[in-house]
């Protein structure tokens, strides 16, 4: 079952089409990475999911209900942090949460529960003005968690964080998903961070979804543009042998470089050269498959 279903979502600012009919499915219980370069349409999509922008075309369904028809009921089950958290700098974490607790009509004990979840229980009398960026982001998540949502929507929550802050944020989100069953939809342009965190991924570029599915499927997908690099005792002969096999190798700074389509091709090239009496001194597959996949997907224009 999908927690979020988006169909043929189109959005325009003036004459510019920001979203060109995207489809988005977030499985319930997943950590879904919404991945794409800056300006791809990620924040616009999340704002539409939260009803912060008026939908122009398409359908949005959350928890099996239409956002158009059940907006208030749906948003009671959703927590969100879009861009930077909105907090009162002169108030403490507890005081910021107390204001919103009254709005949500949560029991008083919920404040300490969410502060413990995000590791801010010991901030005591410190005002939000004194918080580090990482602490402010965690306070923003505490605010989003206050009313015990089933879905957490986060827009670039690791932006500006130092390496330690990024690790803390990653572990927090994993814990919320694992121990509390919260479905998490997180946007980012940081491929390496998304790879370590999510179960499912959608790649958006120029307002169009380029890929959607389990992260494991994206990793298995064979991109174009991967290379095989090698050195032999006779590169001239190696070039001729490879050409006879239909492999277009080229000389590049003392090495031979040729395209590859699979890991099996690496072994085949090695066997071919050795069978012709060549000595292969070095053989390496170039390119990060996941990185190459991502770059290939986002560079395609509609």
Regions found by a protein language model. Name each.
Residues 90, 231, 259, 283-284:
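Active-site-adjacent beta-strand anchor residues
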Residues 3-6, 11-186, 191-205, 211:
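ABC transporter nucleotide-binding domains
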Residues 170-260:
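ABC transporter nucleotide-binding domain
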Residues 65-68, 105, 209, 233, ...:
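Short, surface-exposed acidic/glycine-rich loop or hinge patches that mediate macromolecular interfaces
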Residues 261-302:
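C-terminal coupling/interaction segments
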